[in-house]
Amino acid sequence: MAVPPVEMYSGSFWNRMRKPLPLRTQVIRFTVVFVIVSFILAVALQITHERMPDPKVTKPLPDLGFELLTKVPGMYVLADCCIGFLNILSVFTAFKLYLLHRHCVGSGEPELPCNIPGVSRFFLSVWLCKENCRIELRNVHTIAWIRFITSYALLLLFRSVVIVMTSFPAPDDLCQNPPKIENPVKNVILTVLTAGGGSIHCGDLMYSGHTVILTLHLMFHWIYGAMVHWSFRPVVTVVAIFSYYCIVASRFHYTDDVLVAIYLTIATFIAVGHNADGAPWQLQLFIRWWPCCGANSREMTEDSQPVMVAFKSEAAGQSSRKVVDERNH
């Protein structure tokens, strides 16, 4: 049995493991991780579909939310529309965060090839931060994306395990006569490409994937949307609450599916946190060893600016100058 090298137990080894990867590298690698997790979830959804109890034999479980809310079939379509709206709003917010970053580092506002009155100013102007301004603006867009995508990947990976472990009877009308999956590979690919909208899957009840992405958008705008405009918080909160109602009212998920997803998403987003180094170092361990998809050293980081530092050599007694790169924080 091989004995681990002594240096693994030394402080220097763990210091190297804690050294943050470049933010750009984290963006690329964690996005790749998210795609891999999406395929894992797609396979888990297929297994869950095959293991789902027969609706003709097993009836839906008692649910207080079902008893309090009148059933409105098809309301889940409105939840999908709300998710689409929040997707667009989050992309817009991320772009505005990028403009705040450019403003912080002294870059000018980008310009369109042709100036369109009103439109250019709305999209390309810097909306100066008025709330949550304790967050450093440098690289805020990159850090926000890393926080969002790592939280999403963790939640989907855990959901892949949970939906396979226990099979619940489907409460929605669409899964009372579940269709047969004829081409499993095609169904997996469609699940990833359409985020589940164009594939066949029933029985993936604990916990709600729709609620995960809704709550992620809610948390994203609660923290970062307020930096762009004060109205983003109340607007996204109302949209998210209405979407939760649509999910339960359409019987798309049990009420517990929604409540558990809300709790897990909020807890995960808070645990990942906002840090100038990107994701927590424990999560960076999973991508640190990759031989591709970005550099492993932060010696030259994005948006770094050279600073001249003079120091005196004690050995030679002469002054020398070196150019070092300011850390990208």
UniProtKB/Swiss-Prot annotation:
Enzyme Commission designation: 2.7.8.27
Presence of the UniProt keyword Chaperone in the record: no
Keywords: Kinase, Lipid metabolism, Membrane, Sphingolipid metabolism, Transferase, Transmembrane, Transmembrane helix
GO cellular component term, pick one: Golgi membrane
Highest rank taxon of the organism: Eukaryota
GO terms for MF: ceramide cholinephosphotransferase activity; ethanolaminephosphotransferase activity; kinase activity; sphingomyelin synthase activity
Role this protein plays: Bidirectional lipid cholinephosphotransferase capable of converting phosphatidylcholine (PC) and ceramide to sphingomyelin (SM) and diacylglycerol (DAG) and vice versa. Direction is dependent on the relative concentrations of DAG and ceramide as phosphocholine acceptors. Directly and specifically recognizes the choline head group on the substrate. Also requires two fatty chains on the choline-P donor molecule in order to be recognized efficiently as a substrate. Does not function strictly as a SM synthase.
Name recorded for this polypeptide: Phosphatidylcholine:ceramide cholinephosphotransferase 3
Organism: Trypanosoma brucei brucei (strain 927/4 GUTat10.1)
Gene: SLS3
